Amino acid sequence: YVYSYDELKNIKDIEKFFDIRPEGNWEGKIILDELKVPNEEIIKKLMEIRMKRKKPFFDKKNQLDLNCLWVSSLVSLNSVLPNEGYLKQAENFYEKIEKNFCSKNIFHSYSENISFIEDYAYLIQCLLDLSDSTMNPKYRISAKKYCDEAIKKFYDGNNKIFQKNEKRKNDIFMKPIDISDNTLPNANSIMLINFSRLGFIDQAKELSVSLNGYLNIYKNFMVSSLKAL
């Protein structure tokens, strides 16, 4: 998105449309600052320069947790615009998720050997959202099944909290836990809400006590946990 003066100086009349100087306007390079809307010929020349460059990395992998969040978003949108077909889109999209991510084991992305607690958390959440909106019992049945799986695979019974990775016998050094909100609400908060929605009262009580303990230290990073509690 930046250019050198040498790249631009031979484009006819470019100085009429952009403020370009030999010394540049950002660390010796030029960020194009429009003086007026450029014509198609100028844009074509600029694109020709850019097409010769190495393109930035683009992450093409699909993630289960993000796709499930999209389903929940469609369900929420349906509650506001019920006649626009968003609920049907959500159901169709979930069918693709089930086919591509859940046909054998739950997996996070392209590797069928890896899954994380956030995958289960958001999968269960989207199933419960679909269940509440469609009243189709199959979604709630699946949500309960995956919740049981999540407890078996990720729940640390000693610390009363979900760890990020699956429990394995070779957990030697550390067991990372997901309690802080980053780009998404943390998985333990989502699982606490899932427990409550499914009627897993004992599990919800146990997890809420653990999250409340972490809140005393990390409350600035656990906004979603406050909501869950």
What are these regions (language model features)?
Residues Y1-L229:
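Glycan-recognition and catalytic cores of secretory/periplasmic carbohydrate-active enzymes
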